[in-house]
Amino acid sequence: MVWPRLVLAACLLAMPPAAAECLSQCSLCAVRTQDGPKPINPLICSLECQETLLPSEEWERCQGILSFFPSALRLRDQSGLDSRAALEEVYGELAKRARPFLQELEKSRFLPSTPAEDKFRGLLGGLGEGLGSEAMGAPQLNSGAVEAAALDFDEDPKEQVKRYGGFLRKYPKRSSEVAREGDRDGDNAGHEDLYKRYGGFLRRIRPKLKWDNQKRYGGFLRRQFKVVTRSQEDPNAYSEEFFDV
């Protein structure tokens, strides 16, 4: 029940005085012709009176009917002062009654004065702020990466080893590089550290050829390292040495 009253009040408040006069005259014509064969439609008559619709047949009929009633002519000739005063009183009462409802609706944002574009505009504004923050964050990340790279470049290699757990490619260096540098500089400390750290798997070191290993592994050393054992030596060589003595 609240919405129809609000709509009626809004229509009456937004209606100009000329439209009110047209509506009153057309309503009077409709009342006079309601029992006739062709009653006048007050809505069409009022629109034709305001020159909104063409042709103005209903309005012409209404003017012809009003010409037969002196009261209507007198009201029209006097510019409808009394009717305007009455209409103003009605409009004032309606405005007073409708003002609280309109204020409540404005507070709760139910009126069409707040379209959905405001919502989309807010979403677009949020997206724009997000994109701006991302655009500002990208240079910061890039600058942070550059600073980290500069610190890593200026940092001591041993500190980098402690920091990254020894999984760098440039430090510690490979065994071949360390061996070449040790031969040129005469410093084998780095190679020894690597040998102790990785358990001798950086370079191939042949085991010492001992007879204990020969006894232990059998003929493996003879085949692998071409070791000549006493069993393979010529026994005549020992006999010749004995005769010479």
Swiss-Prot record:
Is Oxidoreductase tagged as a keyword?
no
Name it: Proenkephalin-B
Got a GO cellular component term for this one? dendrite
Q: Where in the cell is it found?
A: Secreted
What are the record keywords, sorted?
Cleavage on pair of basic residues, Disulfide bond, Endorphin, Neuropeptide, Neurotransmitter, Opioid peptide, Secreted, Signal
Q: What is the recorded post-translational modification? A: The N-terminal domain contains 6 conserved cysteines thought to be involved in disulfide bonding and/or processing.
Question: What is the source species?
Answer: Cavia porcellus (Guinea pig)
One GO process term, biological-process aspect: chemical synaptic transmission
Write out the propeptide range(s): 21-161, 175-195
Q: Known InterPro entries for this protein?
A: Opioid_neupept, Proenkphlin_B
What's the family? Belongs to the opioid neuropeptide precursor family.
Q: What PROSITE patterns does the annotation carry?
A: OPIOIDS_PRECURSOR
